[in-house]
Amino acid sequence: MTIAIGKSSKEPKDLFDSMDDWLRRDRFVFVGWSGLLLFPTAYFALGGWFTGTTFVTSWYTHGLASSYLEGCNFLTAAVSTPANSLAHSLLLLWGPEAQGDFTRWCQLGGLWTFVALHGSFALIGFMLRQFELARSVQLRPYNAVAFSGPIAVFVSVFLIYPLGQSGWFFAPSFGVAAIFRFILFFQGFHNWTLNPFHMMGVAGVLGAALLCAIHGATVENTLFEDGDGANTFRAFNPTQSEETYSMVTANRFWSQIFGVAFSNKRWLHFFMLFVPVTGLWMSAIGVVGLALNLRAYDFVSQEIRAAEDPEFETFYTKNILLNEGIRAWMAAQDQPHENLVFPEEVLPRGNAL
């Protein structure tokens, strides 16, 4: 037998291969190429939000207190949007507005654009992380497809909607009570609850919650009792080859309850993916429509009849009056720079008054 001794046929690794090996190495927390986008942007987005809610006032942009330092709590603190006068400026720290002054940048609302843009890229990086990991372990990329729903909603609400309006001012501020206020704004100015895309979104999200509850309960109800552990978590090996629960039994049960049931796991789980993701995408499309000031359903005949007949009123006409009240009160409070003053005779009144 002849043994050939010589140089290895492998070529030396270039910089890209070395980085690829290090980034995709098997470790406790996967980094990957997507991590180069995800980790820095998520760090800056969260850091900006914690900084803003802790220290930064909204007095100069909204006339509000919005930080822990001013007495807010977790539910009322927020990173507020820039003033309406700043329109769609990126509000870069080194830009003409702040001119490198960090304090002035915070006062102008620069942290909001900072958090919004870094947060958007962090969400995209997280979706790419799911793609990358799925490819590495030879899975299909449906996790990433599912995560596109929340990304679509975030981008449409925080970026596309204010881009269609006069400025970032009309986007939601990053805070719990601030987003509640934004929801009221959406109802008053866009009649959002009567928008068909909102209806599809509600059906998707609540339908998904119902599907999750039914699915979880059904699996628990049809577990095979062949484990000897003290509870569900100890009774089965995560790498077992056999089924954990009986699809046949579940099918028979729901066939008797509803008259119809899913016949296989693939269709069942695809449906559980399809319902919430489609609902979120429909909501996102609806918000893009609102950015262009597209209207929801208008039942003008009911409005005309209610105006002519004091005894005629529907839940729709009552809601329209409520929306007018939201606009009349919120516009003056929310946009003090417009100096809006409404005479009492134009403020909405119910037909009984």
From Swiss-Prot:
Q: Which InterPro entries match?
A: D1/D2 (IPR055266), Photo_II_D1/D2_sf (IPR036854), Photo_RC_L/M (IPR000484), Photo_RC_L/M_CS (IPR055265), PSII_PsbD/D2 (IPR005868)
This chain's protein is named: Photosystem II D2 protein
Q: Give the record's keywords alphabetically.
A: Acetylation, Chlorophyll, Chloroplast, Chromophore, Electron transport, Iron, Magnesium, Membrane, Metal-binding, Oxidoreductase, Phosphoprotein, Photosynthesis, Photosystem II, Plastid, Thylakoid, Transmembrane, Transmembrane helix, Transport
EC annotation? 1.10.3.9
Q: Which organism is it from?
A: Adiantum capillus-veneris
Q: In the record, which positions carry Phosphothreonine?
A: 2
Q: Which residues bind chlorophyll a PD2?
A: 198
- Into which family does the record put it? Belongs to the reaction center PufL/M/PsbA/D family.
From the UniProt record, give one GO term of the biological process aspect: photosynthetic electron transport in photosystem II
